[in-house]
């Protein structure tokens, strides 16, 4: 497929209502976990994006039947699957290919995985996956690929050396099939981890402590069929809050999943953006003074990411762009990935006042008038942040490699245009 370019005419106010897509980071582990059961599974509210399409190709390659029965409904039947060398070209497209380790190990006793791909946002180690699965009885060999073998998985007291989301998900899925009780400690507790756990419960698994950092899994579970609806994407909701703020636009985000938005709302409140909750809808008013809230004692305020339930790393790029349109100075501290802030040079070229202190910290002084500019998206979240900057800038911007944005945001240009944005999606022009 030819690379995609967005041509964005900035300076237009938006208005209306928008519903967030299903959570990509829920959909990927849940699609993989559907391989655990021999019975049919129907998944609703699945975002139809490149990453989910690629994972569907991967599960088909090991023998699962998978069919899109509606725009966002996926039917999976893994009645008979086989251990197979996964296609390296598919695996390199998405980091989520590593999520197949747990379910294939459980069903087939072995799996061979080429190195996973995904965003280039810094060092993303696989050690936690390996250590967790080894504690459940797997033997892991690393050559030009990762080979996992486990004729039988056994419950264990597993302590993760870091609260990695995908390692938690792999260990959780494997533990459901393991013989005996597994204690999964220092586990990630993000909404998408909770979504996966609730899906496994819908299949018949017995899991205690969902939403906490210690889960207890009683295995092996007898799994059946299920129809399951994937929850709204809280990261997309945060992106839409930022979009409404930088364009000074009134926006209603419907069926937003507000129970998972408290830390996100608090983060934006530091930038002077207050949202109103009505039922499960989130309203971003347009008549707000975007002023960064000072810390007590006059210190420069700071917004930092941390593991859930704190402000999520996937929204730091959005928060940086939003801060360029707010009055005041703030320090942004990205703790998790050492390459995620490198896109700020594009914002500086557009007129933003940003000092990149080191790979993890940036100081933003606002407000700044942004001017349209050519950009290239390095990853999903920075690409979406660039799109926010382009929509609020004066003049026209181009965003090359917009395919990266579409890996995480479904039909985003179409949905934003319905609110009043002016975004053209065209094949990328070769220079």
Swiss-Prot record:
Subcellular location per the Swiss-Prot or TrEMBL entry: Cytoplasm
Cell inner membrane keyword on record: no
KW Cell cycle (keyword) present: yes
EC top class named in words: transferase
Binding residue positions for UDP-N-acetyl-alpha-D-glucosamine: 95, 314, 336
GO molecular function: UDP-N-acetylglucosamine 1-carboxyvinyltransferase activity
Reactions performed catalytically: phosphoenolpyruvate + UDP-N-acetyl-alpha-D-glucosamine = UDP-N-acetyl-3-O-(1-carboxyvinyl)-alpha-D-glucosamine + phosphate
One cellular component term from this protein's GO annotations in UniProt: cytoplasm
Biological pathway: Cell wall biogenesis; peptidoglycan biosynthesis
EC number: 2.5.1.7
Active site, renumbered: 119 (proton donor)
Coiled-coil positions: none
InterPro entries tied to this protein: Enolpyruvate_Tfrase_dom (IPR001986), Enolpyruvate_Tfrase_sf (IPR036968), MurA_subfamily (IPR050068), RNA3'P_cycl/enolpyr_Trfase_a/b (IPR013792), UDP_GlcNAc_COvinyl_MurA (IPR005750)
SUPFAM superfamilies in UniProt: EPT/RTPC-like
GO BP terms: cell division; cell wall organization; peptidoglycan biosynthetic process; regulation of cell shape; UDP-N-acetylgalactosamine biosynthetic process
Pfam family, one: EPSP_synthase
Annotated positions binding phosphoenolpyruvate: 24-25
UniProt keyword annotations, A-Z: Cell cycle, Cell division, Cell shape, Cell wall biogenesis/degradation, Cytoplasm, Peptidoglycan synthesis, Transferase
HAMAP family named in the record: MurA
Role played: Cell wall formation. Adds enolpyruvyl to UDP-N-acetylglucosamine.
Protein family (similarity comment): Belongs to the EPSP synthase family. MurA subfamily.
Protein name: UDP-N-acetylglucosamine 1-carboxyvinyltransferase
């Amino acid at each position: 497929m030819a690379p995609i370019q967005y041509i964005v005419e900035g300076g237009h106010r938006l208005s209306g209502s928008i519903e967030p897509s299903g959570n990509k980071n829920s959909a990927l582990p849940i699609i993989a976990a559907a391989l655990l059961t021999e019975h049919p599974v129907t998944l609703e509210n699945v975002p139809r994006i490149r990453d989910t399409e690629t994972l569907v190709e991967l599960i088909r390659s090991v023998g699962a039947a998978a069919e899109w029965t509606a725009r966002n409904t996926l039917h999976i039947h893994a009645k008979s699957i086989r251990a197979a060398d996964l296609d390296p070209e598919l695996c390199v497209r998405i980091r989520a290919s590593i999520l197949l380790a747990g379910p294939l190990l459980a069903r087939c006793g072995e799996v061979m995985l080429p190195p996973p791909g995904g965003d280039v946002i810094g060092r993303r180690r696989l050690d936690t996956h390996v250590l967790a699965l080894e504690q459940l009885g797997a033997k892991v060999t690393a050559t030009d690929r990762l080979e996992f073998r486990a004729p039988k998985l056994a419950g264990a007291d597993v302590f993760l050396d870091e609260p990695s989301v995908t390692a938690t998900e792999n260990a959780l899925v494997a533990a459901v099939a393991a013989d005996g009780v597994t204690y999964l400690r220092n586990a990630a507790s993000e909404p998408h981890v909770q979504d996966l756990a609730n899906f496994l419960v819908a299949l018949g698994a017995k899991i205690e402590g969902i939403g906490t950092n210690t889960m207890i899994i009683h295995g092996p579970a007898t799994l059946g069929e299920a129809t399951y609806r994937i929850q709204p994407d809280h990261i997309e909701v945060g992106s839409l809050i930022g979009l409404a703020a930088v364009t000074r636009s009134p926006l209603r985000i419907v069926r937003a999943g507000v129970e998972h938005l408290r830390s996100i709302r608090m983060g934006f409140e530091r930038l002077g953006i207050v949202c109103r909750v009505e039922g499960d809808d989130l309203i971003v008013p347009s008549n707000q003074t975007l002023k960064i809230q000072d810390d007590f004692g006059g210190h420069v305020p700071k917004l930092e990411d941390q593991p859930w339930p704190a402000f999520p790393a996937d929204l730091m790029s959005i928060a940086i762009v939003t801060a360029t349109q707010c009055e005041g100075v703030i320090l942004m501290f990205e703790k998790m990935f050492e390459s995620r802030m490198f896109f700020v040079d594009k914002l500086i070229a557009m007129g933003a006042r940003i000092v990149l202190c080191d790979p993890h910290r940036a100081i933003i002084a606002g407000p700044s008038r942004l001017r349209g500019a050519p950009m290239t998206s390095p990853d999903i979240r920075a690409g979406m942040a660039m799109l926010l900057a382009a929509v609020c800038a004066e003049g026209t911007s181009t965003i090359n490699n917009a395919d990266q944005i579409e890996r995480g945001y479904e039909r985003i240009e179409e949905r934003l245009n319905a609110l009043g944005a002016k975004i053209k999606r065209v094949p990328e022009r070769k220079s």
